[in-house]
């Protein structure tokens, strides 16, 4: 999902290995964890949740979004679980946000992301 001047969302791959791993893990949702006080500033990586039939805002463990909006997206605070931050190459996130999308906010062309997790 690509929403210019707001977020990019990914993680839900249609690759066969991803489908296999999801079957092994099973279907489950995670409760929001908003007590840490992390704000949805530009570059924050957070967990999305559906607003449809989801009053407790449970999140998919298989997806994530990155705040691209300059100035942050603080209206998301308290509703979604931030768990990381882009520390290099925000220009890549900006370039993804510049891609053409269809009416469902899906990129016209496949965008593959390689993500490296750095622990403190």
How should each PLM-predicted stretch be described?
Residues 1-120:
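Cyclophilin-like peptidyl-prolyl cis-trans isomerases
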